[in-house]
């Protein structure tokens, strides 16, 4: 699994887009239009972008996604997914 953890303005998105392209992965993000524009600016084509909402609907309806997945800003995705239920205040993660 790839983890891109870095500060602002450090090309995290372009690196994640390259990973998505190389792994034929769906790029899950909050704003697909903005990411499509960025991908074109980076010269990256052939990436399927899916919003958090679309991704959740596919998982809910099909129970799976038959492609690899990368998620831009995992914390935002978690907040989007669970925020109506409760307030997300922390998590842990293991280094690999």
Where are these regions (language model features)?
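Conserved P-loop
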Residues: 1-61
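Aromatic-residue detector
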Residues: 9, 21, 76, 90-92
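Short, flexible beta-strand-to-coil junctions
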Residues: 30-32, 93-96
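Conserved RecA-like ASCE ATPase "motif II neighborhood" in helicase/translocase motors
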Residues: 45-89, 96
